[in-house]
């Protein structure tokens, strides 16, 4: 089992899968929370635009549209949300940097599933970059920052938490304390210490190339495994081994992690669920004469 410790409090469209975990049915929804845009050069790092632009669209300002999907997993007695999108509490100046677009919201997507924020029992944050945890905290009627999911326990890896508290200069703009400190102060934040099973059929594994302690969910049953790849593979276009995101803090480690994961995904025919690819929601890994590649499902 995954080892969890607890923090001490201070004074859109869905893709539905059902997996039988041997105890009950897991209902899995890939839900949309809206889109944002980032520079293609930053997203694809050292890969020349002449190559990546054949695989992913950019506008005349070199901006690529990116989805912000969350994963909703429902079991008999748990409703687990993985990531919360960018949220809506930041000011207009902040949002203007990221060209938000799309009609979907996290609240609206949950409503389409017949759920309210109060129904969520667990919120897993893959990491604490603003586009993954911004919706974890909201303003209440009195203007106080409070957990958006009042009945939920929140989870993040211990390594990511420490990384966010002491960010490096390169990553600092991605960490906004108002997105996660209110969770700690409310006493509802728990820390994942190691890889392991969160609930039956639902395993969390850590990767460290993009950022320290990135949590990646694996959902398995009867020989089928779905992986919500988060920023391990932002787009299907990032599957080729040397196509490493420019935002990754340890690109050589990303290469190692990708090589091992892609070989595993190929051998086991994993279904990959993409969080940021605006055009491909699900895919598989194949091997060609050029190496690992992705095929959309």
Q: What is the predicted function of each stretch?
A:
Residues 56-61, 142-143, 204:
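Short, P/G- and charge-enriched loop/turn segments at secondary-structure junctions
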Residues 4-12, 16-24, 255-257, 262-297:
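C-terminal regulatory/interaction regions
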Residues 133-144, 284-285:
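Metal-dependent catalytic neighborhoods of phosphoester/phosphodiester hydrolases
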Residues 19-27, 33-113, 216-231:
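Conserved beta-strand hairpin/beta-sheet module of binuclear metal-dependent hydrolase folds
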Residues 80-82, 124, 154, 226-228, ...:
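Residue-level marker for buried hydrophobic side chains located in beta-strands
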Residues 19, 87-88, 98, 101-115, 119-131, 146-206, ...:
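Metallo-beta-lactamase
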């Amino acid at each position: 089992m995954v080892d969890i410790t607890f923090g001490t409090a201070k004074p859109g469209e869905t893709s539905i899968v059902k997996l039988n975990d041997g105890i009950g049915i897991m209902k899995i929804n890939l839900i949309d929370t809206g889109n944002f845009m980032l520079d293609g050069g930053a997203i694809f790092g050292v890969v020349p635009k002449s190559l990546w632009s054949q695989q992913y669209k950019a506008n005349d300002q070199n901006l690529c549209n990116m989805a912000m999907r969350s994963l909703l997993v429902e079991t008999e007695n748990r409703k687990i949300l993985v990531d919360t999108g960018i949220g809506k509490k930041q000011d207009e100046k902040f949002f203007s940097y990221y060209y938000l677009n799309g009609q979907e919201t996290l609240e609206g997507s949950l409503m389409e599933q017949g759920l309210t924020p109060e129904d969520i029992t667990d919120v897993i944050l893959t990491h604490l970059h603003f586009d993954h945890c911004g919706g974890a905290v909201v303003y209440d009627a009195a203007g106080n920052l409070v957990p958006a999911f009042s009945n939920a326990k929140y989870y993040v890896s211990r390594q990511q938490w420490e990384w966010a508290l002491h960010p490096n200069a390169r990553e600092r703009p991605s960490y906004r304390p108002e997105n996660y400190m209110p969770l700690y102060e409310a006493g509802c934040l728990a820390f994942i210490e190691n890889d392991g099973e969160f609930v039956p059929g639902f395993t969390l594994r850590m990767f460290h190339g993009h950022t320290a302690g990135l949590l990646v969910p694996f959902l398995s049953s009867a020989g089928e495994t779905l992986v919500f790849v988060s920023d391990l593979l932002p787009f299907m276009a990032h599957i080729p081994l040397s196509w490493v995101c420019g935002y990754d803090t340890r690109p050589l480690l990303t290469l190692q992690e990708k090589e091992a994961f892609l070989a595993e995904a190929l051998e086991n025919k994993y279904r990959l669920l993409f969080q940021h690819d605006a055009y491909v929601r699900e895919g598989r890994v194949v091997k060609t004469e050029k190496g690992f590649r992705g095929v959309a499902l």
